[in-house]
Amino acid sequence: MQVNVETISPVSKKVSIEIPADQVNSEIEKTYATIQKRAKIQGFRPGKAPLQLIKRTYADSMRDEVMRRFYETTLFKTLAEHKIEPIDAPTVECDILEEGTPFKYSALVEVMPEVLLTQYTGLEITKERYVFDPQKIEDEIARMRDGMAQLVPVEGDVAVEMGHMVTIDYAFSVDGFPEESTSAENAVVEVGAHRLLPEFEDQLVGMKCGESKHVTVTLPEAYRNPEVAGKEGAFMVTLNEIKRKELPELNDEFAQQFGEFETVEQLREKMTEYHQQHEQDRIEQEQRETVIQALIEKNPLDVPQSMVKRQVEQMLQNLKNRLKSRNMSMEMMGMDDDSFRERVRDSATDKVRGGLLLMALIEKEDFSVSDEEIEKRYEKLAGGNEEMLERIKEHYTSSPSVRHSLIAEIKEDKAVRFLLDNAVITETDPAETAAEA
């Protein structure tokens, strides 16, 4: 048997194998003999059909069986002898198997790249300086009050103002022809919120109950109905009712509706604590992504396409799960599976690169995980909930593979922490960070 191993790229090898004719003949004979024993052909007792008839009837089955055995006995033996570890099923190309002729085939095998970390300390990155803005808490409280507002009918001869909630009938027409898909009755609109068309809402200001008017607008190119998107047309609007929002008072009674709070000050304190933690977590996650990207840029690495494909499919499934939990679909987001795959391919490639580089760093620095660190991770995941803590422990001790996944996650966090501790970090103000983005 002749074997040739060729390196195609850092992540792929081509294995070419030629099996001599005498070995091919031997396997063909043995296979036909086996088929002859079990073949059931009309007019012949089992095992008594002539060999020539067996060959004519079962030639394709013979070829499939012989080639399968050759792959099993020669390909995997060759891979083992040359210490080639495939990370996906090999892609095989072969000649036609014929008696009296050597059988040649080749297998393209994807392998893990050799990861050489040339620079992983002194990585230069930026970090957003956290600055607490109390106004964000007040803005959130204002949104909470707005969400609990009561709608009170406006009495008397009153015209629509910004902020009013109005009930309207409207019908849209283009060039005098009605578009039923862009019409509604008793639609509720918050004037000035611009949840519909700003140009449309602004022209409602000044209308009074019972009044009708024409409102001319140009629909945006991205309008939900493609048949009228980008066209100029007219709405015939009839105003049925005007209501105003009556906000609840900002007092202790208001605060008590949001959990175990006795006063507005307690509510503010908890919201401030949550906001600060949320912002710090966000900055930490951004730092993590930034330092991994810096690691990728300093350590170029080819990655197997099969790993990228798996990462893309995982990202697609994660998105579908999130959309399903919100009763949404890919179509509602204006995309399909293929367009999403194309959109995330580059980021999926970087995720694979980053993962391989972190694995190499973990091995190089010999990071380990203690039982105490595992317990701390359990507690972090439980968030102080004792019942949840027990369920988490039960889950991660249910099998060695599940426990291993947690240990791998902790090791990866340690590797990222190592990168950050040894990086050159320049702090920037939030405004500068936003401008760079």
From Swiss-Prot:
GO terms for cellular component: cytoplasm. It holds the Pfam family Trigger_C. The keyword Isomerase applies. Its EC number is 5.2.1.8. It catalyses: [protein]-peptidylproline (omega=180) = [protein]-peptidylproline (omega=0). Keywords: Cell cycle, Cell division, Chaperone, Cytoplasm, Isomerase, Rotamase. One of its GO terms (molecular function) is peptidyl-prolyl cis-trans isomerase activity. It is found in: Cytoplasm. It is an enzyme of class 5 (isomerase). The keyword Transferase does not apply. Residues 163-248 form the PPIase FKBP-type domain. Its main location: cytoplasm. Consists of 3 domains; the N-terminus binds the ribosome, the middle domain has PPIase activity, while the C-terminus has intrinsic chaperone activity on its own. Involved in protein export. Acts as a chaperone by maintaining the newly synthesized protein in an open conformation. Functions as a peptidyl-prolyl cis-trans isomerase. This is Trigger factor. It comes from Pelobacter propionicus (strain DSM 2379 / NBRC 103807 / OttBd1).
